[in-house]
Amino acid sequence: MQDILLIKYGELALKGDNRSFFENKLIKNIKHALSDFKEVKVEKTHGRIYVECDGDIEEVIERLKKVFGIVGITKAKKTDLNLDEIFKAAVELMKGHEGKTFKVETKRPNKSFPYNSMEVSRRVGAAVLKNVKNLKVDVHNPDVLLNVEIREMAFVYAGVIEGIGGLPLGTNGKATVLLSGGIDSPVAAWMMMKRGVEVEAVYFHSPPYTSERAKDKVVDLCKVLSQYGQRIKLHVVHFTDLQLEIYEKCPPKFTTIIMRRMMMKIAEKIAQKNGSMALITGESLGQVASQTIESLYVTNASVSMPIFRPLIGMDKTEIIDLAQKISTFEISIRPYEDCCTIFVPKHPATKPKLEKVIEAEQKMEYQKYIDNFEEEVIEV
């Protein structure tokens, strides 16, 4: 008898002709997540993905809970085609469910097995009732469904541990996220990763107005995001000179929106150079002055690349809840200013007109900064 995990996936099963592509990518991502477990084996048989574990199964489960594309993880036992072994496996699995109701459900694709599905279910149920205290059978609405599958081997499993869901990372191209160090942008990156998008990150650094600790905070956020399946390339752009140019030469009410437009232009250049097909931001409609629908329209007009804003309809409390769930919140609230919080005007324009903003931009020579920005690349 061997402990294994049965991996359940949702949307992948709906992908038609591309199903094998998604399944193979998921298997590759599972192997990557478990690469330092020498005793783990991953395989796909009968349309199922199995993970065989000889070591710490709980630690393996914790890793798998961060693999996008997995909707459920089920602890299972693989045994020989022997009723006594099947009974033993069923009893072990049900020992954690005392006081509950259960039902046994058997599938028997292997028709050479001498007992039919009903007989296997009946015998397994009797063995469980005999050896596990305080259990009752409920065939209509059981607390626990105990499954038995009779194939070339027998598989016995019960209960499901919730996975993270989504699509396997790497199945939907690559995008570049503008990562500020605040609460919102890492959540936006995570949400796009959940839809199968690989991400790179751009952080705008403005020393001496922003400290090295602010940059370290962004590096730490990338480390957390990388736990969900990929190493993240962080592009640190030195933004001080361009930010001072904006502050000194542009009307105060437009400095925030112009700064956002310059960031977009630089991020687009980095994205194009590195094979990204879109930008990602953590903007939520109406949250601050630069996130009104008019401001977002003006920001969009600065680039030709699509801009994804997965948080656009979320409340701040919803964003914070998700940040706490994915373990970025405590890092994001470290008290170190980023470049978006310096030189903030008292009365920023909330309904800027594109032509007025472009006119204001002409007061400075911004193109030389965009063409010759200083960049540091950190792989996390």
Curated annotation (Swiss-Prot):
Taxonomic lineage from the root: Bacteria, Bacillati, Bacillota, Clostridia, Thermoanaerobacterales
Domain of life: Bacteria
Role played: Catalyzes the ATP-dependent transfer of a sulfur to tRNA to produce 4-thiouridine in position 8 of tRNAs, which functions as a near-UV photosensor. Also catalyzes the transfer of sulfur to the sulfur carrier protein ThiS, forming ThiS-thiocarboxylate. This is a step in the synthesis of thiazole, in the thiamine biosynthesis pathway. The sulfur is donated as persulfide by IscS.
Domain THUMP: 58-162
Family: Belongs to the ThiI family.
Name of this chain's protein: Probable tRNA sulfurtransferase
Annotated organism of origin: Thermoanaerobacter sp. (strain X514)
Keywords: ATP-binding, Cytoplasm, Nucleotide-binding, RNA-binding, Thiamine biosynthesis, Transferase, tRNA-binding
Record keyword Electron transport present: no
Main localization (coarse): cytoplasm
Any one GO MF annotation of this record: ATP binding
Catalytic reaction annotation: [ThiI sulfur-carrier protein]-S-sulfanyl-L-cysteine + a uridine in tRNA + 2 reduced [2Fe-2S]-[ferredoxin] + ATP + H(+) = [ThiI sulfur-carrier protein]-L-cysteine + a 4-thiouridine in tRNA + 2 oxidized [2Fe-2S]-[ferredoxin] + AMP + diphosphate; [ThiS sulfur-carrier protein]-C-terminal Gly-Gly-AMP + S-sulfanyl-L-cysteinyl-[cysteine desulfurase] + AH2 = [ThiS sulfur-carrier protein]-C-terminal-Gly-aminoethanethioate + L-cysteinyl-[cysteine desulfurase] + A + AMP + 2 H(+)
Residue numbers binding ATP: 178-179, 203-204, 260, 282, 291
HAMAP family: ThiI (MF_00021)
Ranges that cross the membrane: none
